[in-house]
Amino acid sequence: TIQTIGHDKLNQLRHVRFFKDIHGMVLHMRKHADILRPKFETVLSGLKNELGGLEIGSWLEPRGGYFISFDSLPGCAKAIVAKAKEAGVVMTDAGATFPYGKDPQDSNIRIAPSYPTPEELKTATEIFVLSVKLVSIDKILEDK
């Protein structure tokens, strides 16, 4: 057996045989989008309906990808993720998008809605939103 450093040619061949051409790949990715879209819509509508206008968090509505980037009040992200975990919602670690996971503002949370079912996401979003509200209230009162 000879091992080389470089592209996995056999895997590339599998992809070419499966997708046939760029149009085949685009069609396949549309199927992924059809599966993911309702999941993202569930989370985004929960954020908008419950946190919109409160000025305790902001988020980006992605146009592709697998994550929603949420920014809390500074100093709250780790506490929000911990509070959600207490209620049974396991999330990506706060600050995971930063090198070594060290968010200098402790404000960024990456939400990954691709795995849970839409029903689970609805409940998880409700818990996340409540966690954001509770931690934000504590932070605002602490800063007064």
Predicted regions and their residues:
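PLP-dependent aminotransferase class I/II
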Residues: 1-50
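Short, contiguous acidic/charged loop-to-helix segments that flank catalytic cores in large enzymes
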Residues: 2-6, 33-34, 56, 70-72, ...
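Non-transmembrane alpha-helical segments in soluble domains
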Residues: 16, 44, 48, 69, ...
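Glycine/serine-rich loop-strand microenvironments at binding/catalytic pocket rims
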Residues: 16-22, 70-76, 125-129, 133-136, ...
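Surface-exposed helix-capping loop/turn segments at secondary-structure junctions
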Residues: 26-27, 47-59, 136-142
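Conserved glycine-rich beta-strand-loop-beta hairpin in the small C-terminal domain of fold type I
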Residues: 30-44, 56-71
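Conserved C-terminal alpha-helix-loop-beta "cap" of PLP-dependent enzymes
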Residues: 67-110, 118, 123
